[in-house]
Amino acid sequence: MIPASAKAPHKQPHKQSISIGRGTRKRDEDSGTEVGEGTDEWAQSKATVRPPDQLELTDAELKEEFTRILTANNPHAPQNIVRYSFKEGTYKPIGFVNQLAVHYTQVGNLIPKDSDEGRRQHYRDELVAGSQESVKVISETGNLEEDEEPKELETEPGSQTDVPAAGAAEKVTEEELMTPKQPKERKLTNQFNFSERASQTYNNPVRDRECQTEPPPRTNFSATANQWEIYDAYVEELEKQEKTKEKEKAKTPVAKKSGKMAMRKLTSMESQTDDLIKLSQAAKIMERMVNQNTYDDIAQDFKYYDDAADEYRDQVGTLLPLWKFQNDKAKRLSVTALCWNPKYRDLFAVGYGSYDFMKQSRGMLLLYSLKNPSFPEYMFSSNSGVMCLDIHVDHPYLVAVGHYDGNVAIYNLKKPHSQPSFCSSAKSGKHSDPVWQVKWQKDDMDQNLNFFSVSSDGRIVSWTLVKRKLVHIDVIKLKVEGSTTEVPEGLQLHPVGCGTAFDFHKEIDYMFLVGTEEGKIYKCSKSYSSQFLDTYDAHNMSVDTVSWNPYHTKVFMSCSSDWTVKIWDHTIKTPMFIYDLNSAVGDVAWAPYSSTVFAAVTTDGKAHIFDLAINKYEAICNQPVAAKKNRLTHVQFNLIHPIIIVGDDRGHIISLKLSPNLRKMPKEKKGQEVQKGPAVEIAKLDKLLNLVREVKIKT
């Protein structure tokens, strides 16, 4: 703390006090006159002269103390420095500025003791000091010898024999004294503990070698595509073909055969197709890379995104739209079938056709991959609409297809051509009505491939691939029970039931279910073709889908155009659960990860997700996933990833990700391990069904 007078110079300027006595004395001395005595001079008063504009402060203000605070900021440091950022492409201000201010610098000549240079200088000083000490010792020994010489002369004659030995000893001592002692060189330790060593590996000498291959010849080609140039090219090609034909005729028959074989192997068409195949493979890889960059945000959502809002709502979930698949060639066709590949989890097959019998045209079979949503991996076209399909479990490259005209076919994805490898015909027993569903089954006893089909003609047919031919066997013929018509001749005709859907039991190999257009569901057996095991009065309209539960062996599900979805126990003829979705149901599918979760799609464009373990009465997700005028036709769960694919009647396929609430797993309890597996899923569904079974049995 310092006084205000010294602290605030701007408030009180320097005072100029002039002593009148001293001034008069000085002037009197100069003039040589005397004014008074010395005692009178000191007693005289002194007046202070102030400038007229000086600030006058009170005593309290003068005694006020001010505190000065020293800061490390440099007042002269610039505050507006900017630098160019190449990352953002703009000038960015620099927030941190060096505050160092140098007031005084002086170059010194002091060297630190611990530095290398300081150690070397100290070593040189020790050498100089040692040499000086040795010189002093030599001079002192010389003086001593001079003093001892008289004593040596006074020695007795009898001691003459010891003179040579003494002289030799004196010479040794003189040599030792003359050679200065070299102090031991101390190893200078590096304060950074750094050691530099050369590499012990052998460096190969650099050699210049010329390239032994000749560069391919280069030619510059330029032309314009005109009508006459194209015509000339065709004429030249025709002449070449005629010349080759003439040469073949001139050859002998043996040479002709060998020439034909060689030409067959090396024809221009085959070489061109090989080049096109290689080019198509490279183009497919490039297309996938471009699509992965284009749809990177969707791929990130597919892999990592989960709806965080599910933490705050227990019984409600959402569907996140991901990729959308469509093709220009299938614009006006409906999605009639969906099926995931059992081996390649990102690949799924789509069947295109039409459900309107007045607008029947061509059909298509496309296989899409999640890695390339812009274009299908495989594309096959047919003259009739594709109504159903199924992919073999053990041979994922074989696709069984059912057509609207009643034919069934097998497509081999390994073969490049677009025609089916095997196809039925009128001679081989094709259906007379549309084929609504096909299912691969286990191979027969001779290890022949086998699949089943159901059609509106009432026949359930087993197709076996024997010697590259499709051989059919009618397993069962559907008949409407209790309804017969009499003809004038007195004969009775039994109406044929129209099969629309079927599904085989997962464990009981011979048992399967069949849904019909009349709304009935028949439990059938492969061993009995004349009668049904059981009949269920399921729906009031056509049964669109029948599906066994993947975990529980007694439970199956059905849906219909009468707006309902029903869950059944095949030992009870009445449904366990009935759900009214207020619109025609196109398809239902069980979830592969839970026995209580299933999905349904309706013609009003909505997807419904149910979880019986959370809510037995209504869906936990009702979400529109298509445009208002689009009707949803099919839905399928992925076997591993938490996504579903949905198809509509405009040829669009939409992939949707399930939120965490739609795929809840059992919660972990303290001190207990989470139980997983089919047994847990069966017990979970049994717990729900037991409550309903008791009521059904009582009634």
Swiss-Prot record:
Cellular location(s): Dynein axonemal particle; Cytoplasm, Cytoskeleton, Cilium axoneme
Region (Disordered): 1-54, 140-170
Alphabetically ordered keywords of this record: Cell projection, Ciliopathy, Cilium, Cilium biogenesis/degradation, Cytoplasm, Cytoskeleton, Disease variant, Dynein, Kartagener syndrome, Microtubule, Motor protein, Phosphoprotein, Primary ciliary dyskinesia, Repeat, WD repeat
InterPro entries, A to Z: Dynein_IC (IPR050687), WD40/YVTN_repeat-like_dom_sf (IPR015943), WD40_repeat_dom_sf (IPR036322), WD40_rpt (IPR001680)
WD repeats: 320-370, 375-413, 422-465, 474-526, 531-570, 574-612, 618-658
GO cellular component, as recorded: 9+2 motile cilium; centrosome; cilium; cytoskeleton; dynein axonemal particle; extracellular region; glial cell projection; microtubule
Any one GO molecular-function label of the UniProt entry: cytoskeletal motor activity
Disulfide topology: none
Keyword Metal-binding: no
One Pfam family named in its UniProt record: WD40
Superkingdom classification of source: Eukaryota
SMART domains documented for this protein: WD40
Any GO BP: determination of left/right symmetry
Gene3D superfamilies: YVTN repeat-like/Quinoprotein amine dehydrogenase
Keyword Phosphoprotein in annotation: yes
Entries under SUPFAM superfamilies matching the protein: WD40 repeat-like (SSF50978)
Tissue expression profile of the protein: Expressed in respiratory ciliated cells (at protein level).
Location, primary (coarse class): other
Location of Phosphoserine modifications: S131, S134
Subunit and interaction comment: Consists of at least two heavy chains and a number of intermediate and light chains. Interacts with BICD2. Interacts with CFAP45 and CFAP52. Interacts with CFAP53.
Disorder: Ciliary dyskinesia, primary, 1: A disorder characterized by abnormalities of motile cilia. Respiratory infections leading to chronic inflammation and bronchiectasis are recurrent, due to defects in the respiratory cilia; reduced fertility is often observed in male patients due to abnormalities of sperm tails. Half of the patients exhibit randomization of left-right body asymmetry and situs inversus, due to dysfunction of monocilia at the embryonic node. Primary ciliary dyskinesia associated with situs inversus is referred to as Kartagener syndrome.
Family: Belongs to the dynein intermediate chain family.
Physiological role: Part of the dynein complex of respiratory cilia.
Protein name stated in the entry: Dynein axonemal intermediate chain 1
Annotated organism of origin: Homo sapiens (Human)
Upper lineage: Eukaryota, Metazoa, Chordata, Craniata, Vertebrata
This protein's encoding gene: DNAI1
